[in-house]
């Protein structure tokens, strides 16, 4: 069974930048906190959507469902009546980096070429060869993944999926898997980590300015609009 790997990306927010904007547009502390919480939720949902698309594109995943299972957003909203600058709501994105099944990825499947059976030079009889020793090959469409081959494997449609299947020593077969953690970690750094702060600040500023312009206030104890 493939190793279970994960990567959790935390939102790194510059609190001083939030406070600077609050003072600049004359927003209240609670308006800032409400805008912060809403921006956090919007950022988590936005980056989840972007992450799924990033996984599909970077790994050439066949179906959206397989990619969606690899991204989980977690948002912890704190009570605004108890929040301080050092105790704000938090969010993170969890990425599953364990191996993908071959059938989940786009690419070329190839059975091994039939091996010419050798003959005994003295008798002319065919010599025995190890059945299935040579393996099938998978060439991923994604440039971030390398071609792979598995000993004693073959290409066939089993259990509703055309893939590379490996013969097990104990009997039976299992589907071959492709390691993706390195390619995914690079994509996460390139697509997500570099942009998450900018996306959050865009949502935060938009929301906070709207609250100030509309004179929107909330009760710090109930969180209800006044």
Residue ranges and their predicted role:
Residues 1-226:
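Short, Lys/Arg-rich flexible segments
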